[in-house]
Amino acid sequence: MAHTSAGGLRLHTQRLPGRGDGPTVVFLHGLVMDNLSSFYCTLAGPVSRAGHPVLLYDQRGHGRSERPPDGYDRDTAVADLTALLAALGLDRRPVHLVGNSYGGVLALHTALRRPDLVASLVLIDAQLTGDWVEDMTDTLSVAALGLEDSRLPEQLAALGRRKEARLAAGADALLNRTTLIEDLASATAFTARDFARLECPVLAVYGAHSELLPGARELARAAPDCELCVLPGVGHTVLNEATEGLCAAVLTRLGARAGAVAG
């Protein structure tokens, strides 16, 4: 287990080697009940074995990273990532960003704010357009009340479900003892104008039954260079339910980018 000090914040990181000196692939996990392990157990290994160096990290307040009381807005997330790349010496060339769900939101925001840092984007069923900010804020507010009024972490621990107990305790701390919900509520959805400003290639991988697919189609229409890959038979949880198809799409895209750079 490694920690890296980035902009005064201790972030839990994990690196996997690649071959050669190609761009690093940085994975950004989802919100609240997630951490770097979701990628470590799915895409990170195959991507590393294909020759691409990998960086995973627990975002601010998640997993084994430090949990400050505030700073959960998108601009601060970009600053955290920028500081992390600098601390690891990975800011000298653009990196590939792979974001799942809200991690995709942060990856896209990074590409818009710091296009010099991003070689390409892979967005996995990320929330892009529509009323997702309000919907997610409402959902998390209800969850916060439920966690505050229950003893779920203790009950799970008593049943021997230690991993679930840790996740529940972390979610309780994030939702009830930080500004995460307030910071999320201040965000706005992306627009076609935002998509048109993207300077890097984008691969968007979505489930055929996902409620977020319309936003991905809008992205594909508006972005200068975007491939939309729709995986059949799954909804939002593409990373876990369609790992094989997702992995194939990601490796194909990374291989194509490596070939383009080499050529």
PLM ranges: what are they?
Residues M1-R10:
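N-terminal cap/lid segment of alpha/beta-hydrolase-fold proteins
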Residues H12-R64:
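Conserved HGGG/HGGXW glycine-rich cap/lid loop of the alpha/beta-hydrolase fold
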Residues L108-L112, L121-D149:
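Flexible "cap/lid" loop of the alpha/beta hydrolase fold
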Residues E164-D194, A208-H209:
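Hydrophobic, aromatic-rich cap/lid helix
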